[in-house]
């Protein structure tokens, strides 16, 4: 992949993953039918009539290459994917409120799904209709009770191995060493308030999910104190700068690293000792749908090993069904940033309206400093 193609891929993925907290964009309309294979596991869900269209709120191309065609062949239902809205969680609530009954199911991060549930926009999820959900560890299903969790993302460090023989292995070390000759002016952070302030909280030893206003202010000040040594807060292109040596270390996303790692042996991944802030994304059934039985069939179909592996290979996301690892492409299966077993300290961030407002104010202060 060329450098500019890598940067473009990172930008679109970066925006998508913030479904879980603030933003999302882009989509395509897809209605396909084609060839596929049958499965006893898929037929386990009952009650769906054959034929019709399921309408999904989804990010562009966030689907296995063959999933839609194979499901259409087996069940007669096509999947129409409509665009996720700009404007954050409020836009999601407004879109689904004004179009109740139009959509059958949606992609949503754990924080977005929680807000949809609070606004009575989700159908009650019946896990008994998705037998393949048993393949997903309870760690994930308990964090995402609104539907089926599909994948996860996490934030760690990636660094240039040539420049740093002993890189920081924690947020505390990163902040403490920011002014050193090895790191000063060569540190990259995401241009996103939550990720930056989470880093500050972790560096201070705080729990990002129970932070008080005073702790958020401390985190703000900690970030401001190292800002002179930060090269940039950027949306995309961090791995390219790590590889070419213009930056030494970045706080960044596992999927960015997964794209970049096959391109260079000079880039390495670190799961910080405090843990990796993460998020779950999944599919949720929507209130007002007249096709919930078919929705459950598609949920179950998605979690079959071959279909789920197709999804992970296409999206290069971190998987949550351990058994599919042997079916994944080598660049995905062997990526230490994506492998859940190599990142056991991942935890999932929770946001509410008050915390979101506090983060926004703190981020503005960081930008103004």
Briefly describe each language-model feature range:
Residues 1-15, 22-33:
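N-terminal secretory signal peptides
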Residues 35-44:
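Bacterial lipoprotein signal-peptidase II cleavage site
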Residues 46-115:
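Early extracytoplasmic/lumenal segment of secretory-pathway proteins
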Residues 62-65, 90, 103, 107-230, ...:
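Extracytoplasmic ligand-binding site segments that recognize negatively charged/polar headgroups
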Residues 113-117, 249-266:
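A ligand-binding cleft/hinge motif common to bilobed small-molecule-binding domains
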Residues 153, 217-225, 263-287:
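Periplasmic-binding protein-like
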Residues 277, 286-346:
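Mature extracytoplasmic/periplasmic domains
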Residues 341-369:
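Conserved C-terminal helix/tail region of periplasmic/extracytoplasmic solute-binding proteins
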């Amino acid at each position: 992949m060329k450098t500019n193609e890598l940067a473009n891929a990172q930008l679109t993925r970066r925006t998508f993953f913030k479904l879980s907290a603030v933003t999302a964009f882009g989509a395509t309309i897809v209605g396909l039918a084609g060839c596929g294979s049958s499965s006893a596991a898929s037929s386990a869900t009952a009650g769906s009539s054959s034929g019709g269209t399921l309408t999904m709120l989804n990010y562009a191309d966030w689907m296995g290459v063959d999933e839609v065609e194979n499901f259409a062949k087996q069940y007669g239902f096509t999947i129409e994917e409509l665009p996720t809205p700009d404007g954050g969680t409020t836009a999601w609530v407004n879109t689904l409120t004004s179009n109740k009954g139009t959509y059958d199911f949606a992609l949503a991060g754990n924080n977005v799904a929680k807000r949809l549930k609070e606004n009575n926009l989700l159908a009650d999820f019946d896990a008994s209709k998705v037998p393949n959900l048993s393949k997903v560890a309870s760690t994930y299903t308990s964090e995402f009770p609104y539907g089926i969790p599909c994948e996860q993302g996490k934030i760690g460090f990636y660094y240039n191995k040539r420049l740093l023989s002993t890189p920081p292995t924690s947020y505390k070390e990163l902040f403490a060493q920011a002014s050193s000759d090895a790191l000063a002016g060569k540190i990259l952070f995401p241009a996103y308030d939550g990720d930056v302030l989470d880093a500050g909280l972790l560096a201070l030893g705080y729990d990002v999910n129970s932070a008080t206003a005073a702790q958020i202010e401390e985190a703000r000040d900690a970030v401001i104190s190292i800002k002179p040594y930060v090269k940039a807060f950027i949306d995309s292109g961090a791995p390219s700068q790590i590889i070419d040596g213009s930056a030494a270390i970045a706080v960044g996303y596992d999927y960015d690293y997964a794209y970049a790692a096959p391109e260079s042996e000079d880039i390495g991944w670190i799961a910080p000792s405090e843990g990796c802030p993460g998020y779950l994304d999944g599919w949720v059934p929507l209130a007002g749908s007249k096709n919930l039985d078919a929705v459950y069939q598609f949920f179950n179909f998605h979690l079959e090993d071959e279909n789920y592996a197709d999804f992970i290979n296409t999206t290069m996301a971190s998987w949550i069904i351990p058994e599919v690892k042997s079916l994944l492409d080598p660049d995905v299966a062997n990526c230490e940033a994506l492998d859940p077993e190599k990142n056991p300290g991942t935890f999932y961030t929770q946001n509410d309206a008050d915390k979101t407002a506090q983060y926004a104010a703190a981020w503005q202060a960081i930008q103004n400093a």
